[in-house]
Amino acid sequence: MHSLSWFLLVIGLSVGLSSGKWNEKNSVIFTNSLGRNKVLKVNCISNDDNLGFHFLRHGQTYDFSFHDSLFKSEFYCDLWQGPNFKLHAAFTAYEGGGLIVHYGKKNFWDVRDDGIYFTHGQKMPKLEYTWK
């Protein structure tokens, strides 16, 4: 029994150390690519947190990081396009957890005049949402 415990400990450490992403946080990143004088207003919430309002000038980014929950991780975000903040978009910016727990997953949202574009970083961003 003693040797089995050592064996399991060595295997566990080997797997943990060989996979550098096993404890890396997931991230959601917003970039304001709107016109020069347009401010982006962002508010994201989850079941546990309200991350508050963030105002981004052209070219600025806002990001937050977290670990997936064992049940479900979901961040719902509202975006408004300034200066009058009349144009709005609302969507789920991140969904994960449950049976499949993600480590190091990155959701990039590029906010443009014609809509909100999405990528995980490996491909060109694609238009996902339009302004209402």
UniProtKB/Swiss-Prot annotation:
Reported tissue expression:
Mostly expressed in seedlings, stems, leaves and floral tissues, and, to a lower extent, in roots.
According to the record, the signal peptide region is 1-20
Instruction: Please provide, in alphabetical order, the Gene Ontology terms of the cellular component aspect for this entry.
Output: extracellular region
Q: Where in the cell is it found?
A: Secreted
Which superkingdom, per the lineage?
A: Eukaryota
Keyword line: Secreted, Self-incompatibility, Signal
Determine if Ion transport is one of this entry's keywords.
Answer: no
Per the annotation, which location comes first and is thus the protein's main one?
secreted
> Pfam families of this UniProt entry?
Self-incomp_S1 (PF05938)
Biological process GO terms, please? pollen-pistil interaction; rejection of self pollen
Family of this protein: Belongs to the plant self-incompatibility (S1) protein family.
Tell me the PANTHER family matching this sequence.
PTHR31232, S-PROTEIN HOMOLOG 8
Provide the protein name.
S-protein homolog 8
Q: Which organism is it from?
A: Arabidopsis thaliana
Gene encoding this chain?
A: SPH8
